[in-house]
């Protein structure tokens, strides 16, 4: 191998290494922590202020972005993960933990659970913040089952939420 060719390969390798080091895609990096809903947080699909709507909220962190994408309903969180035009490099997904809801049923906007670890009550009588039936997330399966006993519906995990449920009108 000539010196020129060796130098070119070394330079190329150094560039690739530098770019990959700066990409932020370190698989060992911990996911970002959930953020508090701020007064200026706006729902991704509805464009409305999150604090103006009752019910559980969601936030998704896309790799390479510091701020989360906000959602005013849990069905919207699922839609974002399913729609082909939305980003697929997701660093973290959080939903309000309704196990921490107040006695009036209002979501505690400081209580978050990893969406992939949550238990969801779907097809219940609960009307979410956008005026439609919504999936209700819980960190605790027992609390989810109790909610379903009272409000109807069934308990499923993140991967088991049917697409036709997410996109039903």
Predicted regions and their residues:
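C-terminal motif of bacterial Sec signal peptides marking the signal peptidase cleavage site
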Residues: 18-21
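Thiol/selenol-based redox catalytic cores and closely related redox-interacting motifs
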Residues: 91-139, 143-145, 155
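Short cysteine-rich clusters marking metal-coordination/redox-active sites
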Residues: 43
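Short functional micro-motifs and their immediate structural scaffolds
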Residues: 27, 51
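Bacterial signal peptide processing site
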Residues: 23-25
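Cys/His-coordinated zinc-binding microdomains
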Residues: 47
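Bacterial N-terminal signal peptides that target proteins for export
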Residues: 1-12
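C-terminal partner/receptor-binding element of secreted or periplasmic proteins
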Residues: 137-169
């Amino acid at each position: 191998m000539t010196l020129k060719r060796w130098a070119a390969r070394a330079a190329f390798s150094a560039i690739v290494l530098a770019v990959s080091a700066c990409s932020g895609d370190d698989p060992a990096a911990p996911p970002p922590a959930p953020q508090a809903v701020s007064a200026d947080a706006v729902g991704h699909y509805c464009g409305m202020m999150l604090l103006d709507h009752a019910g559980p909220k969601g936030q998704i962190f896309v790799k390479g972005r510091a701020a989360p994408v906000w959602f005013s309903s849990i069905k919207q969180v699922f839609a974002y993960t399913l729609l082909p035009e939305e980003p697929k490099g997701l660093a973290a997904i959080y939903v309000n933990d309704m196990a921490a809801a107040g006695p009036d049923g209002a979501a505690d906007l400081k209580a978050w659970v990893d969406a992939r670890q949550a238990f969801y009550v779907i097809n219940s009588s609960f009307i979410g913040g956008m005026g439609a039936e919504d999936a209700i997330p819980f960190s605790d399966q027992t609390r989810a089952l109790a909610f379903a006993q009272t409000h109807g519906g069934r308990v499923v995990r993140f991967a088991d939420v049917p697409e036709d449920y997410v996109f039903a009108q």
